From Swiss-Prot:
Pfam families: CADH_Y-type_LIR, Cadherin, Cadherin_pro
Entry protein name: Desmocollin-2
Tissue: Expressed in intestinal epithelial cells (at protein level). Expressed in the heart. Expressed in tongue, bladder, stomach, liver, kidney, and lung.
Carbohydrate attachment residues: N166, N392, N546, N629
Cellular compartment(s): Cell membrane; Cell junction, Desmosome
Protein source organism: Mus musculus
Organism lineage: Eukaryota, Metazoa, Chordata, Craniata, Vertebrata
């Protein structure tokens, strides 16, 4: 019972494990079931047959065998023929064994190949009802090999509905390949449900077709739902892998380590991804130049790496590789293409520059500068005109004085040795230089360990030159005491012949002497005092007076030197107070500090002694001096002085007793600071001497002169204005605008044509108006007689727009005023002949027209009668017009417009 109970209690777990095992076995058996492949009756070698699912059957399988040697299976389950196969009986079968060494499991898959079966389009006629197994109206797996050779139409499969047992069913399909692009590629027999393909299909264009199958009765009834039907196009290895570039270019440095990456190539395949058809393998077919092979390519990634560290650009600077890519994981029957790859070896500085010669000999003349004396050549195997090839030269030894310089010729890479500082034959006849050379780019570690820097020795011979005198040292000095007597001789400048080291035959000449104090002896170069020497002069700096001397030899060669005359000081300058005016602000201070200076050397200067230099007892009583230090003293007042200016004489004496008196102007002010100093008015100025300076006097005189000029200008202006008043009487019609456009009849009075108003001016300036006789006024001219012979003439001619006034004063003065542009002579020449003609015509006609010799009254002017003029002198036939009125000045044109408006 216990055993039974035990078995019963464990039976549920045992049953669950048993069911799980059965499920796994069922799935495995379903994955390892028989596979039926539709193939042509003839298969060529290396032809793709189909694909079986190896991973689902036995995932850990590592050994695969086939029972038929005419076929082979790849890792992804693709089945290929190894030789030509003919299905003589229309079918062929073989078995694939799978074995896992880890789990010791074994599986097998049966593969059946079926050739094309000719299916009659005519539905078979049977008189009995066929019994068949029940079918489900469900999706049926269907596939088709791309690029199938047929024969077409190619039978794919048959679709049937379970309702065919009860109804007469018609089958139809729709979708891409039927009623959509590509049209009419598939069709189904209406009665049998057989599905056919009418032509070849390219998987790269159409990976699959999703069709919909329909089952209907003749009367249109649909007993089944539409059936989704997927037709998958099995891929065929019909596309070659293609490199992304036809020519690849890579660079790699020479002497690179093994395994250095050169570059990576890439190829693409249009076949179905993740299959053997697109599993690519890369390889190098050929290397040029020929082996040894220096490069390798990773078969899966296409990365090119180096296999040797002996890449030398100096031997071979470029390699060409022929590379290949092949699908089917590199199987011999896979498709492949090739491309070219150019690998350029990049230069590194692995070769040191070396001199072609180790010793050089050259020469240079002394005293020459900036000349090329030698070119040094080097050899470098690195890339020309690159930093690895260009040389840098250095003078290692022998150029301690900086006489030489070496530079690189950028074109030839030669070293150019130049002299930049003159050489002296008398000092050195030969110079030995050691020159080294390196590259611009740093050396690689391997190169720098091979050999040290390349060096060369250059021997430079200095040749002698007949040169001029040498002024060495260029600055020479002599010591002379100031104020020595004129004519005193002293040593001067000395130049030497560098070859003889003597001064014979050298002549001297003075080039500069700012104050003309000395003369230079032409033969010896000695100097003679020409004027008194003053150490305190402005041209003396730090007690030294410089002159420039030119030395010449017999051939005219020269040199220039400077002679510094050191002037020894004598006590010839007494101390003095430079600030001669001091301010004492009485409110804030009672003293002022005074400082004395001495132009002599300190040995002849301080300490100074300050004292009041005056016999005036008031100065001694009011002021007091107190010593502050060697050069300063304090001046303070003793009594309460008034605000003002005080002259205080002070004597300053140096240590040797030489003294001078300085009169100090002391300002005692009511101020806070010295800048605010102002003297109080009304206070006594003591005994200060206050004077006006020359500039103050000049300013006062200029002010007075300016005032007189202003007064004189005002008087002249007033006098001229009074003289110009009332030159003409107010009632003269010539100077007034009168109304002249009236045409009313005049009065019955007769006016005398000979009457003329005359203005007479007495000596006292009073003006009287009288009437002059006939002939006084002629042509609009008035004459005004004056008491003392003065005469005033007034011309007023309206016709030409011109007024002219002439005034002759009593005492010979003459004033003339022109108001307009026309001159008097032009108007006179124009009007005088016409006035003469008019006067003559009037005189000749007086006897005949006496009644018209007065103003006439015209009451009526007939229709169309020309407007005439009054008076006997009128002439209707006058030829001269009044066109000049059209060219009046602007002011008269305005007057005419005003009159016209009235």
């Amino acid at each position: 019972m216990a055993a039974v109970g035990s078995m019963r209690s464990g039976s549920p777990a045992f049953g669950l494990g048993h069911l799980l095992t059965l499920a796994i076995l069922a799935l495995a058996s379903d994955a390892c079931k028989e596979v039926v492949l539709q193939v042509p009756s003839e298969l060529p070698a290396e032809k793709f047959v189909g694909r079986v699912n190896l991973m689902d059957c036995l995932k850990s399988a590592d050994i695969v065998h086939l029972s038929d040697p005419d076929f082979q299976v790849l890792e992804d389950g693709s089945v290929y023929t190894t030789s030509s196969v003919v299905l003589s009986s229309g079918q062929r079968s073989f078995t694939i064994w799978l074995f896992s060494t880890d789990s010791q499991e074994e599986r097998e898959i049966s593969v059946h190949l079926e050739g094309p079966v000719e299916v009659l389009n005519k539905r078979p006629h049977t008189e009995k009802v066929l019994s068949r197994a029940k079918r489900r109206w469900a999706p049926i797996p269907c596939s088709m090999l791309e690029n199938s050779l047929g024969p077409f139409p190619l039978f794919l499969q048959q679709i049937q509905s379970d309702t065919a047992q009860n109804y007469t069913i018609y089958y139809s399909i729709r979708g891409p390949g039927v009623d959509k692009e590509p049209l009419n590629l598939f069709y189904v027999e209406r009665d049998t449900g057989n599905l056919y393909c009418t032509g070849r299909v390219d998987r790269e264009q159409y990976e699959s077709f999703e069709l919909t199958a329909f089952a209907t009765t003749p009367d249109g009834y649909t007993p089944e739902y539409p059936l989704p039907l997927l037709i998958k196009i099995e891929d065929e290895n019909d596309n070659y892998p293609i490199f992304t570039q036809k020519l690849y270019s890579f660079t790699v440095q020479e002497n690179s380590r093994i395994g250095s990456i050169v570059g990576e190539v890439c190829a693409t395949d249009l076949d179905e991804p993740d299959t053997m058809h697109t599993r690519l393998r890369y390889s190098i077919l050929e290397q040029s130049p020929s082996p040894p092979m220096l490069f390798t390519m990773h078969p899966s990634t296409g990365v090119i790496t180096t296999t040797s560290a002996q890449l030398d650009r100096e031997l071979i600077d470029k390699y060409q590789l022929l590379i290949k890519v092949q699908d089917m994981d590199g199987q011999y029957f896979g498709l492949h293409t090739t491309a070219k790859c150019i690998i350029t070896i990049e230069d590194v500085n692995d070769n040191l520059p070396t001199f072609t010669r180790t010793t050089y000999v050259t020469s240079v003349e002394e005293n020459t500068v900036n000349v090329e004396i030698l070119r040094l050549t080097v050899q470098d195997k690195d890339l020309v005109n690159s930093p690895n090839w260009r040389a840098n030269y250095t003078i290692l030894k022998g150029n301690e004085n900086g006489n030489f310089k070496i530079v690189t010729d950028p074109k030839t890479n030669e070293g150019i040795l130049c002299v930049i500082k003159p050489l002296d034959y008398e000092e050195r006849q030969q110079v030995t230089l050691q020159i080294g050379v390196v590259n611009e780019a740093p050396y690689t570690r391997e190169a720098s360990s091979k050999s040290p820097m390349s060096t060369a020795t250059v021997t430079v011979t200095v040749t002698n030159q007949d040169e001029g005198p040498e002024c060495i040292p260029p600055m020479q000095t002599v010591r002379i005491q100031e104020n020595v007597p004129v004519g005193t001789r002293n040593d001067g400048y000395k130049a030497y012949d560098p070859e003889t080291r003597s001064s014979s035959g050298i002549r001297y000449r003075k080039l500069s002497d700012p104050r003309g104090w000395v003369t230079v002896n032409e033969d010896s170069g000695s100097i003679t005092i020409f004027r008194a020497l003053d150490r305190e002069a402005e041209t003396v700096r730090n007690g030294i007076y410089n002159i420039t001397v030119l030395a010449l030899d017999a051939d005219g060669r020269s040199c220039t030197g400077t002679l510094g005359i050191i002037l020894e000081d004598v006590n010839d300058n007494g101390p003095f107070i430079p600030k001669q005016t001091v301010v004492i602000c009485k409110a804030t201070m009672s003293s002022a500090e005074i400082v004395a200076v001495d132009l002599d050397d300190p040995v002849n200067g301080p300490p100074f002694d300050f004292s009041l230099e005056s016999s005036d007892s008031e100065v001694q009583r009011m002021w007091r001096l107190t010593r502050i230090n060697d050069t300063a003293a304090r001046l303070s007042y003793q009594n309460d002085p008034s605000f003002g200016s005080y002259a205080v004489p002070i004597r300053v004496t140096d240590r040797l007793g030489l003294s001078s008196v300085t009169t100090l102007n002391v300002l005692v002010c009511d101020c806070i600071t010295e800048s605010d100093c102002t003297l109080r008015s009304g206070e006594r100025t003591g005994y200060a001497d206050v004077r006006l300076g020359p500039w103050a006097i000049l300013a006062i005189l200029l002010g007075i002169a300016l005032l007189f000029c202003i007064l004189f200008t005002l008087v002249c202006s007033v006098s001229r204005a009074s003289k110009q008043q009332k030159i003409l009487p107010d009632d003269l019609a010539q100077q007034n605008l009168i109304v002249s456009n009236t045409e009313a009849p005049g009065d019955d009075k007769v006016y005398s044509t000979n009457g003329l108003t005359t203005q007479t001016m007495g000596a006292s300036g009073q003006t009287a108006f009288t009437t002059m006789g006939t002939g006084v006024k002629s042509g609009g001219q008035e004459t005004i007689e004056m008491v003392k012979g003065g005469q005033q003439t007034l011309d007023s001619r309206r016709g030409a727009g011109y007024h002219h006034h002439t005034l002759d004063p009593c005492r010979g003065g003459h004033v003339e005023v022109d108001n307009y542009r026309h001159t008097y002579s032009e108007w006179y020449n124009f009007i005088q002949p016409r006035l003469g003609d008019k006067v003559q015509f009037c005189h000749t006609d007086d006897n005949q027209k006496l009644a018209q010799d007065y103003v006439l009254t015209y009451n009526y002017e007939g229709k169309g009668s020309a407007a005439g003029s009054v008076g006997c002198c009128s002439d209707l036939q006058e030829e001269d017009g009044l066109e000049f009125l059209d060219h009046l000045e602007p002011k008269f044109r305005t007057l005419a417009e005003v009159c016209a408006k009235r």
